[in-house]
A protein has these predicted regions:
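Short, surface-exposed beta-strand/loop patches at domain edges
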Residues: 1, 117-119, 127-209
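N-terminal leader/pro-regions and domain N-caps
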Residues: 2-29
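Solvent-exposed residues in well-ordered beta-strands and their adjoining turns
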Residues: 42, 57-59, 111, 128-130, ...
Length: 210
C-alpha cells in the first residue's frame, strides 16, 4: 500500500536548513491552495483496507485557524475533487503538534473506518487551511534527512529514493494540480485489523404488542 514515509525524511530547503511545504487556503474565498500526496493500495491488499487514522508532521501552525485533512480519489493521475465518505478531519491548532526535526506526528482520526478498495487504486491525502502558517514536512530527493542534518557529513543520510509509490502535488486554486515528482509528504497511515477467529453474536427481539 505504500502507507508511510521513512522516519525523518524531511528535505532541506537551503544551506542544510529544514525544508517545509505550506498547506494553505485563502481566507474568506472559495479558492484554496492545498497540497496533496498520492498513495496506492497495492495488490498486497486485494480486498482493500479500512483506514482509521493518518499521522502528518508539521513544522509550524496557526494560533487560531484549523487545518483540514481529506482523502480523495486520484483521477487521471491527479487528486480528484470529491471527498471519500467520512474522509475529512478538521483539527484545531491545539490538536496540532509541531517540531523542528519532523519527529512529532499530528494524528487525524476518522469518525469511522474509511474503506478504500484495493486493485492498485490510488488516493490522495489533501491538506487545506485558511491560514498561511501551516507548514508540513516533506522529503526531497538528493537532500539530507533532517534527523541526521546535525551529524558530521559522513553520518548524514542522503535521500536517494522515494519511500513509497506516490507523488506530492501543489495547487494554486484547489482545482489545477502540479505534480512534484521528487518530493513527498511525510505521513503514516494506520489501518484497522479485524479478528476473524471469533464469531459475532446478534440478538433480536420483538416487543410485545398490545
Amino acid at each position: 500500500m505504500g502507507p508511510s514515509s521513512r522516519d525523518g525524511k524531511a528535505g532541506i530547503g537551503r544551506a542544510n536548513r529544514p525544508k517545509k511545504e505550506r498547506s494553505r487556503r485563502r481566507r474568506g474565498g472559495r479558492n484554496r491552495d492545498p497540497i496533496a500526496q498520492s498513495f496506492q493500495i497495492t495488490d498486497e491488499y486485494p480486498n482493500g483496507v479500512f483506514l482509521t487514522s493518518i499521522d502528518v508532521f508539521f513544522q509550524s501552525k496557526d494560533e487560531s485557524i484549523p487545518v483540514t485533512l481529506q482523502i480523495r480519489p486520484v483521477e487521471t493521475g491527479l487528486p480528484g475533487s470529491t471527498i471519500i465518505p467520512f474522509g475529512e478531519v478538521i483539527l484545531d491548532p491545539d490538536e496540532v503538534n509541531i517540531s523542528q526535526d519532523a519527529s512529532i506526528p499530528t494524528k487525524f482520526t476518522f469518525d469511522a473506518p474509511l474503506y478504500l478498495p484495493g486493485d492498485n487504486n490510488r488516493f490522495a491525502i489533501v491538506l487545506i487551511s485558511n491560514s498561511l502558517n501551516y507548514n508540513a514536512w516533506i522529503s526531497r530527493m538528493g537532500e539530507v534527512d533532517i534527523s541526521t542534518a546535525g551529524l558530521p557529513d559522513e553520518q548524514q543520510v542522503l535521500i536517494s529514493q522515494q519511500p513509497y509509490l506516490g507523488s506530492l502535488f501543489k495547487s494554486q486554486n484547489g482545482a489545477t494540480w502540479d505534480p512534484s515528482q521528487f518530493e513527498d509528504l511525510k505521513f503514516t497511515i494506520f489501518q484497522a485489523e479485524f479478528n476473524t477467529d471469533t464469531s459475532g453474536v446478534a440478538r433480536f427481539f420483538s416487543p410485545q404488542l398490545q
